[in-house]
Regions:
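Single conserved hydrophobic/aromatic residue that forms the stacking wall/gate
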Residues: 2-5, 9
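Acidic, glycine-rich A-domain
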Residues: 17-191
């Protein structure tokens, strides 16, 4: 438990995740200055000791509020992968995905959402960047390119939760039809 809110503990990655609201309550002036400096690029936030789904889970537990600057900064501070060139994500948003993962408050859907957003935003393919396919009875290609913030992307993903039966054949047909329609070369098809 933290009792000295004036210390530099706010630079710790896990402390930023767990105590972000408490920092604001106990030392609003310093926390506001830190968040302002963070958005201006004057300081960095540590994010190396957490999983992507930790950030997603914290966000999804608080839909009733504005964007969370700390969670956005922690997401943006994640390491950029080196070779995401031709990945097309198929996201399962079905009811079975709401199951708890590892016996924690994190759901399997939180993990799927984290991987979906991270992979799509770092994909270098002109065909698949910022796009994913819904894994449902009527799959769709969803474009996240107009979403600037993590919260916005999560909101779009939430709209595509689908409790219907998943259909692998329909997903493959959608990929094939879209590739033919857009005259995608075989070498550019997703892996």
């Amino acid at each position: 438990r933290i009792s000295d809110w004036s210390s530099d503990v706010c630079s710790s990655d896990l402390a930023n995740l767990i105590y972000r609201n408490a920092f604001m309550r106990h030392d609003e002036e310093r926390r506001s200055k830190y968040l302002e400096d963070l958005s201006n690029g004057d300081v960095k936030i540590n994010a190396g000791k957490m999983y992507l789904y930790d950030i997603i889970s914290k966000y999804k537990n608080k839909w009733d509020v504005e964007a969370d600057e700390t969670l956005e900064a922690l997401w943006d501070a994640q390491e950029v992968p080196k070779d995401y060139n031709d990945i097309l994500v198929v996201r399962d948003g079905s009811g079975s995905m709401t199951t708890s993962a590892f016996g924690t408050s994190v759901s399997v859907l939180d993990i799927a959402d984290a991987l979906t957003i991270y992979t799509t935003q770092h994909n270098k393919s002109e065909y698949y960047k910022d796009k994913f396919i819904t894994f449902s009875s009527k799959p769709e290609i969803v474009d996240l390119s107009t979403c600037n913030m993590l919260r916005d992307k999560l909101s779009v993903l939430d709209e595509y939760d689908d409790w219907s039966t998943t259909n692998v054949e329909s997903v493959f047909n959608l990929i094939l039809d879209t590739s033919v329609k857009n005259k995608v070369d075989a070498k550019d098809l997703p892996s």
